[in-house]
Amino acid sequence: HDHLGHGKSLPEGAVPVYFGDGATWETVVDDIHLLHQRLREQYPRLPILLMGHSMGSFLSRTYLIRYPGTVDAAIIMGTGWQPEMTIRGGLLLAGAIARIKGPDAASKLVTNMAFGAYNKAFGDKPRTPNDWLSADTDNVDRYMADPMCGAEATVGLFRQMLRGLRFNQTPGNIDRMDKNAPILLIAGQSDPVGDMGAG
């Protein structure tokens, strides 16, 4: 499943890594739910498992809060937790840039603040700017060669993602998840998103 503004779901000529004008984090979560409903209709006897990785892990966590009891199990891969001050600062910066350049503008500053520190764990001279994505260099090279990967995220997407992180981390929201659904939380031991396996 491609998220809105990503992969093959991106209309020709559209801005990549941008959910779309007026689209919110909740719009993307509702899109996941629409796919879920279609799968339930097409395969009513099969269990449905939700798996999300990286940004998809954050969207999946929002989904589990907003639509408890709709999936049979979930796998949350490469997820993390951000301090409120980090979220607040990111929202202020991305909001300021969006007011000047528009929400569909990409920002090297915001991208570097969001992902730049991830590569620092891999030495002073990483092989690529994306070494943090995988311990397997072939995976990193395939990612960098794929025209559907690696576009700079827009400030509009960053704002929505930060709002999603804040929503996910709100204790009252966490309590809304289905406590009987099996959920596997998993992260690589060198994954900076998951604090090097610490979560």
What are these regions (language model features)?
Residues 60-148:
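Alpha/beta-hydrolase-fold enzymes
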Residues 52-62:
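Glycine-rich nucleophile elbow surrounding the catalytic serine of serine-hydrolase chemistry
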Residues 1-13:
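Conserved alpha/beta-hydrolase
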Residues 150, 189-199:
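Acidic catalytic loop of the alpha/beta-hydrolase fold
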Residues 20-40:
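Alpha/beta-hydrolase active-site loop
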Residues 185-187:
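Short beta-strand/loop motif that positions the catalytic acidic residue
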Residues 153-175:
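Active-site nucleophile elbow and catalytic-triad environment of alpha/beta-hydrolase enzymes
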Residues 43-54:
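Alpha/beta-hydrolase fold nucleophile elbow
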